[in-house]
Amino acid sequence: MNPALSHVRNWIFDLDNTLYPVSANLFAMIDARIGQYVQKLLNLDAEAAHKVQKGYFHAHGTTLAGLMAEHGTDPHHYLADVHDVDMSVLEVNEALVEALARLPGRKLVFTNGDAPYASKVLDKLGLGASFEAIHDVHATQYRPKPDPQAYQGLCDAYGLDPHASLFVEDMARNLAPAKAIGMKTVWIDNGSEQVPGDADRSYIDYTITDLGAWLHSILETSE
């Protein structure tokens, strides 16, 4: 194990576009369904719905949080609808499965989606038995990443010491609250989110492009 990470006992992973590649286009399908949901709910055309969708995402953390705050949307109905996508696009990444099995300590998924959807994704990826728990949007009381309370709630729920924890995400903005409470942070730079060149990157400890390869590299590094 890389000595710089030898203190890590809790390995926390985002789900979408983190445990599977952006190229699978699974989240792109979900994003499209979210747009359609907003269209139907608010009786808007596609362009107007897209503006509402992205506006809520940036202001509230997720489109769902915005719809709940502004329109009283039922989260269970929303999540069942937008997660009704074809998961045959997902493939098992043997290198990632092996690396996760070798990681010492606890492994958890921290997602703004819900546990039923996350479980289906993990099963398709061959990762159904790789994680101790899934901390989902229901568990955050619908205060999703990057709300700082979501991170503290995760630590409280599982008795995690943030200073002995590492968090992996493809959305850089979701790493800042993790860093603020003492976690090591890993940003997967896979094109799902672009961080401006002049942005403050002090909350990102590691920038990677391939999660499986990076995990193998830290496991095999001794100095």
Where are these regions (language model features)?
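N-terminal helical cap/lid subdomain that shapes the substrate entry/recognition surface
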Residues: P3-F13, T18-V97, P116
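Short glycine/serine/threonine/alanine-rich loop segments
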Residues: L44, T73, G105, L160, ...
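Non-catalytic interaction surface on structured domains
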Residues: E94, R102-K107
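Hydrophobic residues in well-ordered beta-strands that form the structural core
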Residues: P21, V109-T111, W187
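Residue-level marker of regulatory loop/turn positions in helix-turn-helix DNA-binding domains and
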Residues: V92, F110, R143
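Asp-based, Mg2+/Mn2+-dependent phosphohydrolase catalytic module
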Residues: M1-R9, A101, D114-A115, S119-E223
